[in-house]
Amino acid sequence: MADHDVAFWCLYFLCSAIRSNIGIAQTMNVSDRHDLMSVLHMTPKDTSTALALFYVSYVIFDLPSNLVMSRLNPRVWMARIVFATSLVGTCFAAVQSVWSLKLLRFLLGMVIAGMWPGMAYYLTLFYPPSRTGKRIGMYFTASQVSAAVVGLVSAGFQLMDSLGGLTGFRWMFLIYGLVGIVLSFALLWWLPDRPLAPGQVRHRSKWLSWLPHSPEALTGDDATVHYQDLRRVYHPRPWTIRDLVEVLLDWRLWPLTLMYFGVVGVGIGTQLYGSVIIAAIQPTASAITIDLIAIIIVTPLSDRFHRLRAFFFSAAACIQIAGLLVTTFAVNGWARYSGLLMVGFGLGPTVPICMAWTSETFQRRHGEVGVAAATALVSGLGNLGSITTTYALYAGWPEDAMKGPHRFRKSNLVMVGILGLSIASALVMAVLLRMFGNPPSTKLDNDVLNEPEDGAARREAHQPSSLTLRGIMTNLFNSLGHQQEDPSFAIVSSNRLSRAAAARRRRE
């Protein structure tokens, strides 16, 4: 799956760049009045509306897109998302008025909807959900890196200003869009199909016969071992509207949505507010670098101790709160920037942890439709936080956006309160899961609900309680000192060798 991981990273990197380059376009070639706002004669309110319209359509179409992906070939649907996103992104190069910009932003949110939750769903086809956190975190870094790269590359596009009669930002929209269109076709060869059970033959419908064949992610004994590991948690079966309604009525969905709402809103708010601090002091250390470091450190730990996800999420959110308070009340510019770095460090792992916890909870409880619907709803409804920060807070709150020592102070304090709601939701989720558990739906087949097959899974199943200090210390002690002594590891090694030997005998 390593080369396929690169494919997911690249597609998310490029689509994130297409989504966010409107922010760079507002500052390109300002001295010549060839920036986006000057060319289209936009007001700050027009900017806030255009940014918010993206999230409105994203919220509306996130769930339908992910449900379609669960019914169709996932690699084809993911390639469709990239193609449509790139096509709309290319159209930004021809924008001539404010209303057309707003329309394209709405269309962009509509066509890109389902990409982020779709990647989380795609991962559950190949990995147990309890081990997807670090992989989701790795893909999430693509968005962070693209934000930095778009800013750096924009210098080159500014030099192309007036070349061929196009402004620099139009060249930027055009080239990013065309590169994305090329990538969308390459994904048909690059991304893997759904994994098959050993011995199963892939049948293709007539209307998909023209598509290129993608190599299987795993073959031979590796595929057999992988299938035995995955079948304990992966529940593929046809779903109906009634199944979807059961997912929507599951109380576990709503604490996760509130968790996502707060951290995503803070992420967007940090981008808006952070630019004010960065412009004032011109630092050399990047908040994005701190963000990446946190993802690399925390998300693997949240997978290893997946029953402690509430702890990891809450700790990261507390760091964000501390950072917001520092950057709000500190007087010195560098002190305020250090607070911004704290927000970046806390923000990095929270979104991947939230998505991984959603996949883990709803895969076991509702199967494939649970993952598809829950990840889309958490991502979609959670992005209402983005609408809040772009339209109601920061630049969308004129009195709070006035220049002065207290600029954006009220918006920051509102975000502190929203983060408190996210932390409370995580703790409520952990407590209620402790009280009521997460039993599988009675509709899931019993033969896929067997005991864990491998040593890692056995260790996961016997993790101590996540809500006690003893549980935390025991988990850490086992990880540092006794991981190789786990007898279940020897059992699974023996079982895997036996299965591999049996497979060789059958071939002979």
Language-model-detected regions and their locations in the chain:
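Cytoplasmic helix-loop-helix junction between adjacent transmembrane helices
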Residues: 104-142
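Flexible cytoplasmic loops linking transmembrane helices in multi-pass membrane transporters
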Residues: 1-3, 192-273, 281, 374, ...
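Residue-level signature of mid-helix packing/kink "hotspots" within the transmembrane helices
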Residues: 20, 54-63, 113, 148, ...
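Conserved MFS/SLC helix-loop-helix module at the cytosolic interface between two early adjacent transmembrane helices
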Residues: 59-99
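Helix-breaking motifs and short loop linkers at transmembrane-helix boundaries and internal kinks
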Residues: 18, 41, 64, 72-73, ...
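Extracytoplasmic gate region of multi-pass secondary transporters
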Residues: 23, 242-302, 310, 351, ...
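Central mid-sequence intracellular linker of multi-pass
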Residues: 130-143, 162-246, 410, 415-416, ...
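Primarily marks hydrophobic transmembrane alpha-helices of the MFS/SLC 12-helix fold
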Residues: 78, 312-313
